[in-house]
Amino acid sequence: MAHKKAGGSSRNGRDSAGRRLGVKLYGGQLAVAGNIIVRQRGTTWWPGQNVGMGRDHTLFALTDGHVTFKKGLKGRTYISVLPANLEAAE
């Protein structure tokens, strides 16, 4: 009776490449319309003002401006893009 399992090379030895998820633009950074802000699985972050959500929950900028992160209801974090001309008025 063998005391070691033979090889196993055909069963093991596979792994998938990383999916490159995460935040791509951080708070205060300038976003151009269409820029991806976050790639995620599920809704870790939620879209706020001037931010859209794709089929795969990717958040992207709808207008040019600066990225902001804010805590909201139910402990959700909302990502918004504040237009540059609106920030100058504040």
Curated annotation (Swiss-Prot):
The keyword Aminoacyl-tRNA synthetase does not apply. Pfam families: Ribosomal_L27. GO terms for molecular function: structural constituent of ribosome. Keywords: Ribonucleoprotein, Ribosomal protein. One of its GO terms (biological process) is translation. The keyword Ribonucleoprotein applies. One of its GO terms (cellular component) is cytosolic large ribosomal subunit. Belongs to the bacterial ribosomal protein bL27 family. This is Large ribosomal subunit protein bL27. The gene is rpmA.
